[in-house]
């Protein structure tokens, strides 16, 4: 009898260990970048390249508009969780591999379900309006000081220091 209980307990523990709740976006999307989210993305995403575009209007009262294309590699489909600290209506459109895709905006993140992600290279394009908190706009110039964990206030990204990436930046200025 003790043997059966012991084997049953071992089997239950083994089955629970095989589950991967880390892959569920709801477990990873809390405000900011949790250690679990950072470790998840470091393990699953590589070869990251950002192609950023910002349109700066002549009038300071008009909002800056932005677009980012993020290319990345993944060995198997995983949920894509991008950091973007802005209101949901500031996300205008999201495309994945050239097609519009369903997404949610929750707790400072843009989330795309793993069903939409392919093994290999993926390209996500987000049209957005940046939050003003990181933009220091003056009459003749604009600057930003993106200290660690603040890039997500300006554009959708993987805002963690252990995911290195290449950047291409294009500005449309008056």
List PLM regions with ranges.
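N-terminal, polar/Ser/Thr-rich
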Residues: 18-65, 92, 137-140, 159-161
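Intrinsic-disorder/low-complexity, polar/charged segments enriched in Ser/Thr/Lys/Arg/Asp/Glu/Gln
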Residues: 49-51, 63-69, 77-81, 109, ...
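Beta-strand-rich interaction surfaces with strong enrichment in secreted/lumenal proteins
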Residues: 53-55, 70, 100-101, 112-116, ...
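A surface-exposed beta-strand-loop module
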Residues: 85-142
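Surface-exposed beta-strand/loop patches in extracellular or lumenal glycoproteins
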Residues: 69-88, 159, 165-174
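Extended, low-hydrophobicity, Ser/Thr/Pro/Gly-biased non-transmembrane segments
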Residues: 127-174
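Bacterial N-terminal signal peptides
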Residues: 6-15
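Positively charged n-region of N-terminal signal peptides that target proteins for export
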Residues: 1-4
């Amino acid at each position: 009898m003790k043997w059966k209980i012991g084997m049953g307990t071992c089997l239950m523990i083994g089955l629970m260990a095989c589950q991967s709740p880390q892959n569920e976006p709801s477990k990873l999307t809390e405000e900011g970048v949790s250690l679990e989210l950072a470790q998840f993305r470091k393990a699953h995403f590589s070869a990251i390249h950002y192609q950023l575009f910002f349109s700066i209007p002549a009038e300071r009262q008009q909002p800056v508009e932005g677009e980012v294309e993020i290319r990345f590699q993944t060995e198997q489909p995983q949920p894509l969780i991008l950091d973007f600290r802005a209101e949901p209506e500031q996300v205008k459109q999201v495309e994945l591999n050239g097609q519009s895709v369903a997404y949610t905006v929750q707790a400072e993140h843009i989330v795309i379900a793993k069903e939409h992600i392919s093994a290999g290279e993926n390209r996500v394009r987000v049209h957005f309006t940046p939050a003003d908190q990181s933009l220091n706009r003056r009459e003749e110039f604009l600057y930003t000081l993106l200290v660690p964990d603040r890039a997500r206030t300006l554009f959708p990204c993987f805002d963690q220091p252990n995911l290195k990436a290449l950047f291409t930046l294009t500005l449309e200025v008056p």
